Amino acid sequence: MSRMRLIVAGAGGRMGRALVRAIADSDGAELAGALEAPGSELIGKDSGLLAGLPANNIKLSADLWAMSAEADGILDFTVPAATIANVAIAAERGIVHVVGTTGLSASDDAVIKSVTKRAIVVQSGNMSLGVNLLSALVKQVAKSLDANFDIEILEMHHKHKVDAPSGTALMLGRAAAEGRGITLDGHSARGRDGITGARRSGDIGFASLRGGTAAGDHSVIFAGPSERLVLSHQAEDRMIFAHGALKAALWAHGKPPGYYTMDDVLGLKDLF
């Protein structure tokens, strides 16, 4: 069976370079293109060399339409505006679109889902096995514990991360809300400062820390009367996200059009 030909969006960034390395290590995929933002000083650079690998003669380019002509999929960990632009082209080309971009708005998510009647999209706030297992556990614990247990989510990332709370924190918050039978939008508490008053019952709180080179630490705290339960995950290397994204692309190749998540890829929907 031929290898899946994949484009890496944002190939010059930290995550993009990790994706290039993951593809180079894979027996089931090969790099078909390296996408970078128009005007970037990295346009024309060799994607292999940028990723710390031998030269692969695949240069960074801003022309997704051209590079997608012979591709089977795109791995997209960029910024919301770029992802939304990529969605239309990926759908038109009929290639798998793996979306790991965070900071997307509700309207952005609606645009992504709007193409899935004719396109294959796999989207997740986090592509690692551990975090997706954590999400399933959070949902089950939130369902099992009563409202006397307050839910707080703490996350830490490197100092260069531009959005907060992280996409993973929001993913865990949605899992907790689903377990409680509520919506996160109506029960989210963020950025507490000053005289805030007592904690509102039923809220799911978020706190974000930024510093150093942390790849991603997440803890979900269930704080009850006289006891606390803490479920945590620490990412030690962003390669776990790259390998997860690659797994998602290979899983989705040949699937019917639709909207999929890592729960589908990892078979977690029927875990509990």
From Swiss-Prot:
It is found in: Cytoplasm. It catalyses: (S)-2,3,4,5-tetrahydrodipicolinate + NAD(+) + H2O = (2S,4S)-4-hydroxy-2,3,4,5-tetrahydrodipicolinate + NADH + H(+); (S)-2,3,4,5-tetrahydrodipicolinate + NADP(+) + H2O = (2S,4S)-4-hydroxy-2,3,4,5-tetrahydrodipicolinate + NADPH + H(+). It comes from the Bacteria. GO terms for cellular component: cytosol. Belongs to the DapB family. Catalyzes the conversion of 4-hydroxy-tetrahydrodipicolinate (HTPA) to tetrahydrodipicolinate. This is 4-hydroxy-tetrahydrodipicolinate reductase. It comes from Bradyrhizobium sp. (strain ORS 278). The lineage of its organism: Bacteria, Pseudomonadati, Pseudomonadota, Alphaproteobacteria, Hyphomicrobiales.
